[in-house]
Regions:
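A transmembrane-helix-recognition feature enriched in membrane-embedded lipid enzymes
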Residues: 165-190
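A structural signal for short, hydrophobic/glycine-enriched beta-strand patches
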Residues: 23-167
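N-terminal type II signal-anchor transmembrane helix
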Residues: 1-28
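Intrinsically disordered, low-complexity sequence elements enriched in Ser/Thr/Gly/Pro
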Residues: 1-3, 45, 121, 177
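Structural signature of transmembrane alpha-helix termini at the membrane-water interface
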Residues: 20, 24, 51, 181-188
Length: 190
């Protein structure tokens, strides 16, 4: 009985330690100088802002802004809105809009391959939401091999590594872990 209790306590402490570090494990923020910055689709505030910040800091001379090709906001396509946004930027000549037709990060990596050919870059800096960095890096490495680094776009309203402090953070942490596990165990091998 004493041994069982000890195993239960040690197992419980191990589970708590894993849970406490699970949010931090998801986040990879290690940008390196690259040939091109690729801002992943799915969010239109923090990701583009982080990409522009890295462009201004000289991490790469070009930026690809991924935009859902078929998404509409009222009567305008997201691509039209993105074009108008880019035209108003001082860095407009360094930015290319990359239309994304897929609905998953894996599909997005396949769509990006065509856009990368036009900017000829082997060293790619991915920009995505902080919680999405580890999975995105793994997916791009598998689907579209290149020399990748990744930069996290932080949004405290959406996620924090101390995920237990806010309900929304806990939901995002749980959802991203499900997606990461599914990618590693199933989708990666298709």
């Amino acid at each position: 009985m004493g041994r069982f209790r000890l195993v239960l306590i040690v197992g419980g402490l191990f589970a708590v330690a894993l849970g406490a570090t699970s949010g931090r494990f998801l986040v990879v923020n290690q940008p390196h100088k690259s040939d091109v910055i690729v801002v992943l689709a799915g969010e239109t505030d923090r990701r583009p802002a982080r990409g522009l910040e890295l462009l201004d800091q000289g991490f790469a001379p070009r930026l690809l802004l991924n935009v859902p090709a078929e998404a509409k906001i009222y009567q305008w396509s997201q691509a039209e809105i993105a074009r108008k946004y880019v035209e108003g930027l001082p860095q407009a000549s360094s930015i290319t809009i990359c239309p994304i037709y897929g609905h998953s990060t894996r599909d997005e990596a396949q769509d990006v391959s065509g856009c990368l050919q036009s900017v000829s870059g082997r060293r790619v800096l991915l920009v995505t939401s902080d919680f999405h960095t580890r999975r995105a890096l793994s997916i791009f490495n598998r689907v579209l091999p290149a020399d990748y680094s990744v930069a996290a776009a932080f949004d405290a309203g959406e996620f924090g590594v101390q995920w237990w402090r806010h309900r929304e953070w806990a939901k995002v942490n749980f959802d991203e872990w499900l997606r990461l596990i599914w990618w590693e165990l199933v989708d990666r091998w298709r």
